C-alpha cells in the first residue's frame, strides 16, 4: 500500500511539473534591430541574458535587408526590440504577426506613453529615436523591464532594481541641465528629441528627412541667422554632412552658439549621451543668454532708429511746408 502511495506521489509530481512552467535558467536572448540600442539593453540585462543586434555598425538601417542568417537568429530570440520605422523592421513585425517567430516584438513608437513629436518642417511624425527624450527613455526602459520580467520571472527583482537606478540617473541629468527658451536650426531631425526637452525649439531643418535633399532655399535659413530669428545651431556630432559644416560656418560668421549632439546611432548608452548634451548646454548657456540680450538690444535699437528716421522725415516735411507758406505770402 505504501509502495502504491509512493508511486502515485511521484506521478503527481511529474504531472504538476509538466503543467507548471519551469523557471528559466539560461536567461533571455534579446535582439536589437539597431546596434545603438544594445548599450541601453545591457543596462537592464540580468546575468545570463544575451543581447545581440542585426544591422552592422556603419550600415544605413534604412537601406538594410534581412539576411538568411538574420532570419535564423531572430527565430531563436525571446525578445526583439525595434525602432519600428524601417522596412526590415516592418518585416520582423510581419513575421511575428504570422506566427513565423516566437519572439515578443517591441516597437518603440508603439510603447504606451511614448510621445512622438512632429517633424518641424514636414509636420509628419518623427520616428528618429524618440527615446533620446528623457521621459520617453524612462518609459521605454520601464516597459522593457516589465516585459523581460514577464518572460524571465526569476530575474524580476534584478530588472526592477536596475530600472530604479536608471530612473535616478536620468532624473539627476534633467535636474542639472539649464533650461532654455530659444529657437534653433538643426542639420537633421535625428536631434529633435535630444534638445526639445531643454526648451530648444527647432524652427528649421537643413535636411528635413532621411533620403530627402537639403532645404532648397538655404538662403531662408541664412537670412534667419543673420536677422537674429535663430539663436542656436544644433549639429549631429559624429556624422556631419556638408550641410552640417555649412551650418557651423554660418554660426561662426553670425556669432551664434553651436550645440553638438551625439548621434542617436553612435555607441554609448542614452544616459551617457544625455549627460554629454547637458554638459554642452551648460557650457553655452551664458553665451545663449548674452546672445538673446544682444539680439533684443539690436531689435530695440532698430525700433529707435526707425522712430528717429520718421521724426527726421517729419521735421523736413514741416520745414518744407513752412518755407512754402512764407514764399506764398511774399508773393
Predicted regions and their residues:
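N-terminal Sec-pathway targeting helices
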Residues: 1-10, 308, 326-328
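Bacterial N-terminal signal peptides
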Residues: 9-17
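Extracytoplasmic metal-acquisition and chelation regions
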Residues: 17-331
